[in-house]
Amino acid sequence: GANAIGVISEEDKRDFVMGLGAKGVINRKDFKCWGQLPTVNTPEYAEWFKEVRKFGKAIWDITGKGNNVDIVFEHPGEATFPVSTFVCKKGGMVVICAGTTGFNCTFDVRYLWMHQKRIQGSHFAHLKQASAANKLMIERRLDPCMSEVFPWDEIPQAHVKMLRNEHKPGNMAVLVQAPRTGLRTFEDALER
């Protein structure tokens, strides 16, 4: 398995991430290297580069000096992509599956080709893989890290919690045509 390092933006998520088995946690708010890459060879780039190296040192504090990460699982996109491509180890890979902070990703291409790094897009799964993942869920072999479940008529409250960042760490779900949690199949959900 992997030795995961969680990157958080709120300290109250540290214990949650460590409880999931992370080897370590880094708070992104301790660094000022987020957003699109500044123009190379400018004072802004030099400042960005200093901060990225600080972030890399925080990784080394967890992995050991000189041990960069094999894979960066990149979700935010625009705001974090330049850093992800830098901290990934030589021959490593950045896997990107979304762009929640934006789709216009920038990076210093020199660190890609000189260190033979790879960028891989991922859209979760094809139909057969999605079916296999659903089977694992039904068999309760995966933990969805569920923090809260809302009945259908409370969807607006769930959205307000997310908007205000008041939701608990983990995933939230909504009951859709299910009377209660814990039901595993369509047949279980049928009221008899």
Task: Give the predicted meaning of each segment.
Residues 8-12, 29, 75-76, 100, ...:
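Short beta->alpha linker loops
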Residues 86-88:
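Conserved helix-to-beta-strand junction in the class I
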Residues 82, 127-192:
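C-terminal hydrophobic helical "lid"/dimerization subdomain
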Residues 9-19, 103-109, 130:
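Short, glycine/polar-rich helix-capping loops at beta-to-alpha or helix-loop-helix junctions
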Residues 1-79:
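Adenosine-nucleotide cofactor-binding segment
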Residues 26, 90-97, 107-146, 191:
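Rossmann-fold dehydrogenase core element
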Residues 17, 72, 84, 119, ...:
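Terminal peptide-recognition signature
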